Amino acid sequence: MTENALLLLNLGSPDSTRVEDVRRYLDQFLMDPYVVDLPWPLRRLLVSLILVKRPAESAHAYSSIWWDEGSPLIVLSRRLQEAIKPHWPHGPVELAMRYGQPAIEKVLLDLARRGIRRVTLAPLYPQFADSTTTTAEQEVRRVIAAHRLELEVSTLPPFYDQPVYLDALVESVHPYLQQPHDHLLLSFHGLPERHIRKLVKDPAHDLLAESSRNVSPEALALCYRSQCLRTAEAFAERAGLEQGRWSVSFQSRLGRAKWIEPYTDAKLDELVQRGVKRLLVMCPAFVADCIETLEEIGMRGREQFISAGGEDLVLIPCLNDHPAWVGALADMSGRLARPL
């Protein structure tokens, strides 16, 4: 029987916390036209300006969360890779990053050299965005074409509303919900509004809607924000959360362009003003803890919340290598993958 490799795909991380490694990583990341969607000359100019100060600032942030084994994102992704192997009897399980190492190109070439002819991609992004899902899949297409690889590739589509994914979220978060708390904030990664407007052509599509319930199927398939809301609503229903005891926000905005709202930093202050003292925060757009969860929320967000008058902010870990998530990912990859 022909082996079918499972290739886990995530965003990536610098090789180390050294400024030069962080600069190289940021340059590769920000020069991706799916991330900064400007014409090349303008993109190069903007990224060059960003790279004057940002590498040192980011290196400091990475240093605050770096583990002895290396980047938390890479370490946790490796743990997931090892944990899923017994659940994937069809072939090897590999890991690749869109930026940094292990590079998609290197991993695909290695699989081809080993005689693998079928690959199932598992982009580890529950919700769809060009800057995550599309760019990863396009890089796979580029490598296959550039090296004329004879690979039959399928890919796991976004799984923001899949029951097994939602059940894994509920199971992983359940112990934290048993702790005394006033509110649960679901903080998703943000996105420039224009990224969504380019895909969703309906001028009536509301990027300030508080619910996904009235979003058309056509818009839902392309709107990252609506998919985040759908995840949050389905999670809240499954977890039995009371209305008013949870809310949604979007973090990590960069630059002056308008990003999807509400912003997490503004939401933290708002919750304090509403009397929330003990806050739980989960980040369902990420399946592995990384700088955006550990440093941006777990450190800076916590400091902001307490400085504003809150008593405590507890960051709930991502799915990482939770057994329920391991089983869910293997199940979805085998059952839902479609031709690339």
Swiss-Prot record:
<dbReference type="GO" id="GO:0006783">
    <property type="term" value="P:heme biosynthetic process"/>
</dbReference>
<comment type="pathway">
    <text>Porphyrin-containing compound metabolism; protoheme biosynthesis; protoheme from protoporphyrin-IX: step 1/1.</text>
</comment>
<comment type="function">
    <text>Catalyzes the ferrous insertion into protoporphyrin IX.</text>
</comment>
<dbReference type="InterPro" id="IPR033644">
    <property type="entry name" value="Ferrochelatase_C"/>
</dbReference>
<protein>
    <recommendedName>
        <fullName>Ferrochelatase</fullName>
        <ecNumber>4.98.1.1</ecNumber>
    </recommendedName>
</protein>
<dbReference type="InterPro" id="IPR033659">
    <property type="entry name" value="Ferrochelatase_N"/>
</dbReference>
<feature type="binding site">
    <location>
        <position position="292"/>
    </location>
    <ligand>
        <name>Fe cation</name>
    </ligand>
</feature>
<dbReference type="Pfam" id="PF00762">
    <property type="entry name" value="Ferrochelatase"/>
</dbReference>
<dbReference type="InterPro" id="IPR001015">
    <property type="entry name" value="Ferrochelatase"/>
</dbReference>
<feature type="binding site">
    <location>
        <position position="189"/>
    </location>
    <ligand>
        <name>Fe cation</name>
    </ligand>
</feature>
<keyword id="KW-0963">Cytoplasm</keyword>
<keyword id="KW-0627">Porphyrin biosynthesis</keyword>
<keyword id="KW-0456">Lyase</keyword>
<keyword id="KW-0350">Heme biosynthesis</keyword>
<keyword id="KW-0479">Metal-binding</keyword>
<dbReference type="GO" id="GO:0005737">
    <property type="term" value="C:cytoplasm"/>
</dbReference>
<keyword id="KW-0408">Iron</keyword>
<comment type="similarity">
    <text>Belongs to the ferrochelatase family.</text>
</comment>
<dbReference type="GO" id="GO:0046872">
    <property type="term" value="F:metal ion binding"/>
</dbReference>
<dbReference type="GO" id="GO:0004325">
    <property type="term" value="F:ferrochelatase activity"/>
</dbReference>
